[in-house]
Amino acid sequence: MTCDDFRAEDEQPIEVDERRRRLKRKANDDDDDDETVRERVDDAESSMEVFEAEYPPILDPLQDQREAKYFRERMQRFDLYSRTTGLSVDDIDWPLIRGRSLQKGRVAGISFVYDDTRYPINRFSDTWLLCVTKQKLFSFGAGCVEDLNITSFVLRRTMKVLSTYCNWLFEAAKRNNRRHITHKEIQELINRDGFRFHQYLQKFLIGRGMEYTEYNNRFFKYLHEEYNKNPGGLETIYSNQDFIAKETAQANYIYDTVRAKYGGFEELPLFRHALKISFTQPGEHYFSRFYAKRFHEALGCPPLDSEIIMILDWFGVLIMNQIAYKTIRWHEEEYNDGSFPVLDSYHKALADESKCPKACLISISLFPDDPLFDLDIDYGTNPPPVNTAYQKVRRTPRDPTPFYRLMEFEDYKSCLVKMHFNFSELTGEWLRKICARGR
């Protein structure tokens, strides 16, 4: 076939479908049909605006099934642990609750020693949470608590405060347009109390060495200027003279109480073990990923495989410390008979803040709701005993699509410079110019 043949084929008239011709002729002849069609289109658009979902559903049915199954497994364990912790689905406001990873970066200066997640799940029991609470109360001078209602009361109050902290952190992350909690939100919460912020820096953000107790390097000076906005008050914020006095006063009181009531028992290895362990630290010198995952599930936040659980665990120890310290002071102010506090002492000491203002001025936060920070916490009524009937509550999974979109946007921003520039050539003055332009 030659070029002339192709040109001849192109010049041939194209046959138009007869049906299209009839429709076009009918549309030109009938003006009412155009108005009817326009009305139908407007009605369809308005109906789409009314019934359009807030976020499009997940298109992959297999992925949706896997996530729903993962969610049901984790929430089943949450239901199991909630009989001990007292938490319900109404206490949780996690934006991602379908088993997605919420944290990638490091937020603590310490990490897990080894991965022991190979242990079977039936090795963990919800009584471990009660056991840790009992040993922490013992190490804080509240005595060897044999009353299960006391241990349950302290544990449930601690978990309620922790869930409130987690909700606050995620709200702060959403305000900062982040899809997960970063060190910025954690420091924003802890910075509400200067003494706790000092403890946080000392425990999780170690400088050049443990001997540098004044934190005089440039990094902590930057933290101070960023979160306190007062460069002139650096010595006041981080000086040991302001914070060690409070910490020493409470530590000395607890030590004197333990020494007076235990009679030298504090020197035994059993007491040191009770002083070191926590919800994620079953031993004295290591953290356990296995127990950290179970603690995540007890809080209702699967799976959160990150170091943030260490900070939440540290919060839990501080909360129990404050509860025990305040109850002991209140019990001695009321009775002064050398006995250990009972359940009624815990209820009254934590319900009425005005009973012991002088005892609370040393180290206890003066806020009636929050033992550590100035947050509004609705405890409601006292939790029922452990042996009461339990009503299982299920929760439908939320749609995490907007958080996936935010994740893609953040990943794109993080690699934007790498996509347009070669870092091997960006040295010296060129890199400073790019940073100055805000790229």
Curated annotation (Swiss-Prot):
Keyword Disulfide bond (UniProt): no
Annotated region (Disordered), positions in chain: 21-45
Keywords: Developmental protein, Differentiation, Sexual differentiation, Spermatogenesis, Ubl conjugation pathway
Function: Required for male development. In XO (male) animals, fem-3 directs male differentiation in all tissues. In XX (hermaphrodite) animals, it specifies the first 80 or so germ cells to be sperm. Negatively regulates male development when bound to tra-2. Together with fem-2 associates with the CBC(fem-1) E3 ubiquitin-protein ligase complex which mediates the ubiquitination and subsequent proteasomal degradation of tra-1.
Subunit structure: Component of a complex containing fem-1, fem-2 and fem-3. Interacts with fem-1 and fem-2 (via N-terminus). Part of a E3 ubiquitin-protein ligase complex, at least composed of cul-2, elc-1, tra-1, fem-1, fem-2 and fem-3; mediates the ubiquitination and subsequent proteasomal degradation of tra-1. Interacts with tra-1. Interacts with sel-10. Interacts with tra-2.
Name of the protein in question: Sex-determination protein fem-3
Gene symbol of the encoding locus: fem-3
Species assigned in the record: Caenorhabditis remanei (Caenorhabditis vulgaris)
Transmembrane parts of this sequence: none
Organism phylogeny: Eukaryota, Metazoa, Ecdysozoa, Nematoda, Chromadorea
An annotated GO BP: male somatic sex determination
